[in-house]
Structures are given as structure tokens and as C-alpha cells.
């Protein structure tokens, strides 16, 4: 074998010498010269050392002179093709041919109108070989002015956007245009040349025209290669491309190709090429250019393209990397990724594919979305992006208005019931049958009616700009009556506490400490007061009391702290939202501590304890506390009774005596002629606050807690549209659909699943 190699080398040298002599001998025969040149090309291609030897014997210089001097186009084409193939196989031949004289000769052939298309194509081929991977060649092609000639050919070779490649002349022109495009690519990159990149930026308007008018793969592939190499690692070139509208054109082409990819496989492959080009445009300026991408919803387009089954791992890597650059420092694109179920796709790429590059790209995308995911988890339900913000705002306004109307109707019903109760009390006072030695309760009734008036009118809605400015209230001085009412209330509270069998173990620890569990609420004061003094009380209807209301309110600083009604007026007026009439006086907008404190600081453990420590509660929190206290009392009764149940006969008799004694004690303290206002206790609990309704204590005689059936809410047209759109984009991920769209409050994932299956079965089932 070793002896054969020198023998073959010697034979190759002999062949090249003979071929060079034949080339010189057939100077007058163009066809023979063409055949000799093709044979030289074949010998040099089989052996890389043949080009070096052919250069040493002067063969390269002879072929260069032949290409210059020959008048036959056929010989020139063969000579240029042979030079290009020898330079392509051997780098030493490439360096020896890389001279300014040869570049000038090639430029002359390209600018000569007598040169045919095939000769120009061979000249471009030689330029391509000399410039490729050769910084010296890139410099010469710029200094000689050859790059300007190539740019002009790029603009003018193909004049018609509608390519008819079946026509031979059009096909030859297309091959020349494609060679020019490839030569420009090696002029700007491999290695990267910033100066040549800036010169090629002048072609961006022409490139945009081609992309907009011709969507054929034969045009898009070379143009995308040229754009990608021209923009690579050059911020200034990227800015020029975006300012010329190139990024918008690429986005439009990508969207069109993705929509066509469902029908043709080639469109999906072509969309990946456009994706790489777009990624090269935004790599170094992702923060500045990703806003343009969000306008065309490129992230959702890339996610849809990623699901195409025909793509391999390298193509999917290019798509995921482009998604990473789109979502970097752009919250709109990050939100679009979350909305279109992009995170599960990234996690799937991490787990299912074993490609290391693909895993790194998916990790890059997840890292970009880490910040916005944390924001959404902290403020779930607050959507501040695009169209969803307007829709959610309209829905919240409608719900708030509906709640205000509901609260106003409830308060109107309560006013009517109190007026009816006031008329009955007036009749009872006139008959003179209800008398008692307890002090007058006139002030308490007026205070209750005063609160109801504030409920009906919604209080005053005007807010003072200066918070420290106190509002003047028209009043008279009922200090003595109010102190008596407070003492009365404390006596009733003590009496009830002594007769309550549930609290035998609760003892007063001091006069300064208030036991909030036994404090009566605003709505229960009238239930606990049994009789009215006929001498002290004046028979008035609710209308008369309301007329004198402006004169019965004292300055807020002078009202005793024991009055629980005036403290909640402003909270009720904020809930109802009705402006006060001129007869109602302006009051300060006080709220209880439960309303002021941040909700993040409260939880199910410290909420009850915190409200019990408040000196005042609003109607909202009073109802909550009453329902909770009533529920706890029932539990304590059950616990005490269960603890006292024994099988010993003597203890059983003792238990019966205690229960009998407690019942008698209740009868003694309850007046036989006392009469509660109708429906007052029910109205105290029946408020517009959903929390109080949900925590209402069970009916006596029923054991345990019973779940309430949910109120039926029919699906609106918007919800049905949300449901179908969510299934189309996310599949049967009901929980994701539930949190992605603004469904009504109380909707669950299982409700969406059942509704969707009913809608699929038919309209008759969907009505259910």
C-alpha cells in the first residue's frame, strides 16, 4: 500500500502535465479546451495535493489568463468553474487566487452587458469560493466595489415577483439570483464582518418587498439566510432592519405559514426557518423589539407551531429558543405564554425529550416566566392585560351595582317592618296594658330608627378633602338619657348572662373588661328589652321620629362610646351607595378595626379574637360575631349536656333537677306580657353580607351542621364562549380554564365539565 501511494502521486503529476500541454495545444478549439478543463477539475477533486502541484507548474495562472483572453463564452465558463473548484478543494490555492486583479476581472464580467447569465453565474461562484471563510477575501470584495455590484444584481436580476420556474430563462435568472444571495451571505458572515453587514443593510427594503409579495420556499429560504447572517451579533443592523419594517413583515409571514402548516408539511418547515431569522433579529435587543412581537401574538403562534408532529428535536429547539427571547423582559409575552398553556409544554420538553439543548432552552423560558408567575399567584383574579382587563372591570361593576340594589331593597323592607312594629307599640302604649318599673327605652328606639334612616338614605356620600376637619352635627343634649340607656343595656346583659346555662363558668374578671361574647348587637337590643314605660315614652310614629332626627344627633366627639349605632352609619352608606337627603346630617366616616386592618394579617385563627378585642364593630362584623357566638353557645350546650349524661341513677336525678331549675330561672326573668317586635331577630341575621348567611347557626332541634345547597346560576352566553374557547386552546384542563376566564363566582371545574358535555350532546341537554 505504501509503495502504491507514491506511484499514484507520480501518475497524477504526469496526468496534470499532459493535460496542461493539451490545453495549450488546443487553443483554437473551444470544445476540446472545455473537455480538458473538466478533466483537470476531476483530477484535482480526487486528490487534494493535485491543486498544489498544478499551481506549482503554473496551471492556475494559465487558466486565469485563458479566462481573460478567450473570446469564447464557453471557454470562459469552463475556466472559471475549474478555478473555483480547485480553490474550494485547497486553501493554499484559495489564498494564491485571492488578489485584487482577479476581483476586478470578476467585477468586470458581472457588469458587462455582453456576459450571459451562465457566465455571470460562474463569476459569482468564484467570488463565493474566494470570500468564504476568508477575511482577506471579504476585505477585497468591499474595497474593489464588488459588493455594491452584487447588491445591485440582487435588486435587478429577478424583476417579477411571480416566478415561473418552468420557463428556462426565468429558471436561469433565479439560479443567478440565488448565487448572488449566497455570495452576499458569505460576505457578511463566516467570519462576521461588521462593515460588510452595514453595507448590506441597504438591501432591507428590497428584502421586505420580496417577503410580502412572494411566499414561495425558493425565495424565502435564501432571503431568510441573508437576513439572519446580516443581523447576527450586530445591534445597529438589527435596528436598521426593524426601522425599515422588516420585523413586522417577518411576523406576518410567520403567522401565515403557521396557519398553512396544518395543510402542508413544507409550510411548517418554512415557518421554522422564518422563526430562526426572527430570533436573530431580537437576540441582542429583546427588550426593545418584543413589543412588536406581542402585537402579532407571536408567542401563541410559536406554541402552536411547536405542537406540529413533523418537526424534529433541532427544529423544536429553535422554536423554544425563540420563545425564550420573546418572553425575556416582556410581561405581555410572558402572560400570553401562560394564557396559551405554554408552561406545561415547557415542562413536557424538560421531561420527555432527552436532548440537552432542548432542556436548556425550556429551562430558559421557565426562568423568564418565574417573576410574572409569582405576581399572578399573589394577585389572583386581578387581570391587568389587554382585553381581559376591560371585560373583568365591566363584570365587577355590574356585580357591585347588583349588590347595592339588593342591599337597598333589604333595608327598605327593614324600615317597613320597624314602622309596622312602631305602630303596634303605639297601640299597646295607648291601651295601657304594658307597664313596667324599668327605665324608659325611648332613646334606644330613636337610636334604632336613626340607624335605619341612615341605612335607607345611604348616609352622606360627600367626602371632605381634609381628613382632620370635623363635621358639625345638629343635635341636642341627651347625655342623661343616653347614660340611662347604657346602664339599662348593661343590666339586661348581666341578667341574660346569669340566666344562661351555657356560661356558668364565665366569671367577670373586672369592671374594666368587657365580655364581648354576651354584648348585645345593634339589631338585638329591641329583642332583649321587654317593656316600655308609658309615662316616659311618647307615642310617636316612625315618620315623626325621622322628622326630628336632625335634632337628636350630637357632635361625634360628645356622643358616648357606648352608642353602637352611629359608628356603623358610614359603612352602610358605602355598601348601599345612595346619596343622603338634605334632612340627614353629615357624619364622619368611621370604620371598625376589622375593616381597617389589612386582610393579609388576618386568618381563621386570629380573626374572631381580633374582633372581640374591638370596642366597636360595624354591621358587617357584628352579624359575623353574633352568628359565631350563637354557634359556639350551641356547641357549649351540647358539650355540657354530653358531659353530664351518666348511667348512675342519683346523678341522673340531679341532672334533671338542674335542667328544671334553669328552665324556671328563664321563666322568672322573662316577663309574661313582654312581646318582641316581629321578625326583628330574623332581620338582624338576614343581612346582605354573604359571610353572615353562610355562618348562620343551625335551627334548634337539628343536630350537626348541614350543608346548604348552592344557588343555581345559569351559564351566560359569555361563559359558554369562554368554555368553548378554553377547551379549544387548553383541552380538557377544566381547572386551568376556570382560572383563565372570568366565570361567575361559585363556579367549579366540575361545573364546567358537566356543562361542556351537555352542550356537546345537544341543545336540549344544554338547557339543563
Curated annotation (Swiss-Prot):
Tissue expression as described in the entry: Expressed in testis and fetal oocytes.
Intervals holding ARM repeats: 101-145, 341-384
Interaction with TERF1: annotated span: 524-700
Chain positions with Phosphothreonine modification: 648
Protein modification: Phosphorylated by CDK. Phosphorylation by CDK takes place in late prophase when the cap exchange is prominent. is important for the stabilization of telomere attachment but dispenable for the cap exchange.
PROSITE patterns with a match to the protein in the record: ARM_REPEAT
GO biological process: double-strand break repair involved in meiotic recombination; homologous chromosome pairing at meiosis; meiotic attachment of telomere to nuclear envelope; meiotic telomere clustering
Regions annotated as coiled coil: 399-448
Statement: the UniProt record of this protein carries the keyword Transmembrane: no
Domain Myb-like: 707-760
CDD domains in the cross-refs: SANT_DMAP1_like
Subcellular localization: Chromosome, Telomere; Nucleus inner membrane
Cross-referenced InterPro entries: ARM-like, ARM-type_fold, Armadillo, Homeodomain-like_sf, SANT/Myb, TERB1
Region Disordered: start-end pairs: 422-441, 454-475
Biased composition (Basic and acidic residues): 422-436, 461-475
Function: Meiosis-specific telomere-associated protein involved in meiotic telomere attachment to the nucleus inner membrane, a crucial step for homologous pairing and synapsis. Component of the MAJIN-TERB1-TERB2 complex, which promotes telomere cap exchange by mediating attachment of telomeric DNA to the inner nuclear membrane and replacement of the protective cap of telomeric chromosomes: in early meiosis, the MAJIN-TERB1-TERB2 complex associates with telomeric DNA and the shelterin/telosome complex.
Family: Belongs to the TERB1 family.
Assembly behavior: Component of the MAJIN-TERB1-TERB2 complex, composed of MAJIN, TERB1 and TERB2. Interacts with TERF1, STAG3 and SUN1. Interacts (via Myb-like domain) with the cohesin complex; probably mediated via interaction with STAG3.
Protein name from the UniProt record: Telomere repeats-binding bouquet formation protein 1
Organism of this sequence: Mus musculus
Amino acid at each position: 500500500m505504501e509503495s502504491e501511494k507514491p506511484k499514484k502521486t507520480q501518475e497524477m503529476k504526469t496526468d496534470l502535465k499532459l493535460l496542461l500541454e493539451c490545453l495549450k495545444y488546443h487553443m483554437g478549439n473551444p470544445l476540446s479546451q472545455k473537455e480538458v478543463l473538466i478533466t483537470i477539475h476531476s483530477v484535482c477533486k480526487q486528490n487534494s495535493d493535485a491543486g498544489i502541484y498544478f499551481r506549482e507548474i503554473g496551471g492556475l495562472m494559465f487558466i486565469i489568463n485563458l479566462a481573460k483572453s478567450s473570446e469564447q463564452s464557453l471557454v470562459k465558463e469552463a475556466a472559471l468553474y475549474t478555478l473555483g473548484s480547485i480553490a474550494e478543494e485547497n486553501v493554499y490555492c484559495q489564498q494564491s487566487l485571492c488578489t485584487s486583479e482577479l476581483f476586478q476581472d470578476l467585477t468586470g464580467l458581472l457588469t458587462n452587458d455582453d456576459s450571459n447569465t451562465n457566465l455571470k453565474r460562474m463569476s459569482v461562484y468564484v467570488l463565493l469560493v474566494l470570500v468564504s471563510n476568508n477575511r482577506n477575501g471579504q476585505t477585497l470584495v468591499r474595497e474593489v466595489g464588488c459588493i455594491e455590484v452584487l447588491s445591485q444584481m440582487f435588486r435587478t436580476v429577478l424583476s417579477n415577483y411571480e416566478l415561473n420556474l418552468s420557463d428556462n430563462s426565468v429558471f436561469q435568472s433565479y439560479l443567478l439570483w440565488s448565487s448572488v444571495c449566497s455570495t452576499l451571505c458569505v460576505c457578511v458572515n463566516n467570519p462576521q464582518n461588521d462593515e460588510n453587514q452595514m453595507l448590506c443593510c441597504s438591501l432591507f427594503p428590497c428584502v421586505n418587498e420580496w417577503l410580502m409579495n412572494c411566499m414561495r420556499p425558493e425565495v424565502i429560504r435564501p432571503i431568510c439566510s441573508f437576513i439572519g447572517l446580516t443581523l447576527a451579533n450586530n445591534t445597529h443592523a438589527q435596528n436598521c432592519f426593524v426601522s425599515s419594517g422588516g420585523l413586522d413583515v417577518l411576523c406576518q409571514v410567520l403567522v401565515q405559514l403557521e396557519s398553512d402548516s396544518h395543510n402542508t408539511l413544507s409550510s411548517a418547515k418554512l415557518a421554522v426557518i422564518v422563526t430562526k431569522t426572527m430570533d436573530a433579529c431580537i437576540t441582542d435587543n429583546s427588550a426593545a423589539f418584543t413589543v412588536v412581537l406581542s402585537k402579532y401574538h407571536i408567542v401563541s403562534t410559536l406554541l402552536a407551531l411547536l405542537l406540529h408532529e413533523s418537526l424534529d428535536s433541532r427544529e423544536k429547539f429553535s422554536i423554544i429558543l425563540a420563545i425564550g427571547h420573546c418572553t425575556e423582559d416582556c410581561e405581555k409575552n410572558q402572560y400570553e405564554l401562560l394564557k396559551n398553556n405554554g408552561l406545561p409544554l415547557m415542562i413536557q420538553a424538560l421531561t420527555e425529550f432527552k436532548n440537552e439543548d432542548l432542556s436548556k432552552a425550556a429551562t430558559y423560558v421557565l426562568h423568564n416566566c418565574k417573576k410574572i408567575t409569582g405576581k399572578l399567584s399573589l394577585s389572583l383574579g386581578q387581570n391587568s392585560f389587554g382585553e381581559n382587563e376591560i371585560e373583568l372591570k365591566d363584570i365587577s361593576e355590574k356585580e357591585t351595582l347588583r349588590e347595592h340594589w339588593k342591599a337597598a331593597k333589604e333595608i327598605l323592607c327593614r324600615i317597613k317592618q320597624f314602622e309596622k312594629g312602631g305602630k303596634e307599640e303605639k297601640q299597646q302604649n295607648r291601651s295601657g296594658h304594658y307597664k313596667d318599673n324599668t327605665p324608659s327605652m325611648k332613646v334606644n328606639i330613636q337610636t334604632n330608627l336613626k340607624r335605619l334612616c341612615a341605612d335607607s338614605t345611604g348616609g352622606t356620600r360627600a367626602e371632605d378633602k381634609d381628613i382632620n376637619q370635623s363635621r358639625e352635627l345638629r343635635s341636642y343634649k341627651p347625655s342623661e338619657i343616653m347614660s340611662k340607656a347604657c346602664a339599662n343595656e348593661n343590666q339586661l346583659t348581666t341578667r341574660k348572662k346569669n340566666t344562661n346555662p351555657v356560661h356558668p363558668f364565665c366569671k367577670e374578671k373586672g369592671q374594666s373588661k368587657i365580655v364581648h361574647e354576651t354584648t348585645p348587637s345593634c339589631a338585638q337590643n329591641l329583642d332583649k328589652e321587654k317593656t316600655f314605660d308609658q309615662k316616659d315614652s311618647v307615642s310617636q310614629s316612625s315618620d315623626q321620629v325621622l322628622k326630628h332626627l336632625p335634632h337628636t344627633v350630637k357632635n361625634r366627639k360628645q356622643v358616648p362610646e357606648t352608642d353602637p349605632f352611629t359608628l356603623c352609619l358610614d359603612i352602610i352608606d358605602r355598601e348601599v351607595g345612595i346619596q343622603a337627603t338634605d334632612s340627614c346630617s353629615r357624619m364622619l366616616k368611621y370604620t371598625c378595626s376589622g375593616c381597617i386592618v389589612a386582610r393579609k394579617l388576618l386568618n381563621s385563627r386570629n380573626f374572631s379574637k381580633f374582633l372581640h378585642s374591638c370596642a366597636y364593630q360595624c354591621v358587617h362584623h357584628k352579624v359575623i360575631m353574633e352568628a359565631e357566638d350563637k354557634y359556639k353557645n350551641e356547641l357549649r350546650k351540647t358539650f355540657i349536656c354530653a358531659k353530664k349524661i351518666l348511667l348512675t341513677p342519683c346523678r341522673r336525678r340531679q341532672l334533671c333537677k338542674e335542667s328544671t331549675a334553669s328552665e324556671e330561672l328563664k321563666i322568672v326573668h322573662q316577663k309574661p306580657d313582654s312581646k318582641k317586635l316581629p321578625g326583628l331577630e330574623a332581620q338582624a341575621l338576614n343581612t346582605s353580607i354573604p359571610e353572615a348567611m353562610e355562618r348562620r347557626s343551625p335551627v334548634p332541634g337539628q343536630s350537626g351542621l348541614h350543608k346548604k345547597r348552592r344557588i343555581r346560576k345559569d351559564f351566560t352566553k359569555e361563559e359558554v364562549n369562554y368554555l368553548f374557547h378554553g377547551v379549544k386552546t387548553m383541552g380538557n384542563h377544566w381547572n386551568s380554564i376556570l382560572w383563565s376566564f372570568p366565570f361567575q363566582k361559585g363556579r367549579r371545574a366540575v361545573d364546567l365539565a358537566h356543562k361542556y358535555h351537555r352542550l356537546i350532546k345537544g341543545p336540549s341537554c344544554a338547557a339543563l
